[in-house]
């Protein structure tokens, strides 16, 4: 029963990460799996589950605060291209994304679809 709860939790973490950030699902899944595994181990060893939950929540608050302090806005076309190129693993795709974002603006929507047409 606990394994099923843990699997559902990890699945939900991956879905929320994808919905909010669109990236980072692997990292979020690995972190969630480690938290579930170590949490169950600690509870089995006698730790208070509510105390454990409160500790995790405090850690999440502190980590979020630290990340937000070090975050940098991505504003210029060049910054967008560099960031997109890292995510895509390809500079030419990063440039295409930056160009598309330049055309639609900050509130615009870009839809990417796989083509079944060879060479287009």
Swiss-Prot record:
InterPro entries: Cpn60/GroEL (IPR001844), Cpn60/GroEL/TCP-1 (IPR002423), GROEL-like_equatorial_sf (IPR027413). Belongs to the chaperonin (HSP60) family. Together with its co-chaperonin GroES, plays an essential role in assisting protein folding. The GroEL-GroES system forms a nano-cage that allows encapsulation of the non-native substrate proteins and provides a physical environment optimized to promote and accelerate protein folding. The lineage of its organism: Bacteria, Bacillati, Actinomycetota, Actinomycetes, Mycobacteriales. GO terms for molecular function: ATP binding; ATP-dependent protein folding chaperone; isomerase activity. It comes from Mycobacterium genavense. Its EC number is 5.6.1.7. Keywords: ATP-binding, Chaperone, Cytoplasm, Isomerase, Nucleotide-binding, Stress response. Forms a cylinder of 14 subunits composed of two heptameric rings stacked back-to-back. Interacts with the co-chaperonin GroES. It catalyses: ATP + H2O + a folded polypeptide = ADP + phosphate + an unfolded polypeptide. This is Chaperonin GroEL. Pfam families: Cpn60_TCP1. GO terms for biological process: protein refolding. GO terms for cellular component: cytoplasm. It is an enzyme of class 5 (isomerase).
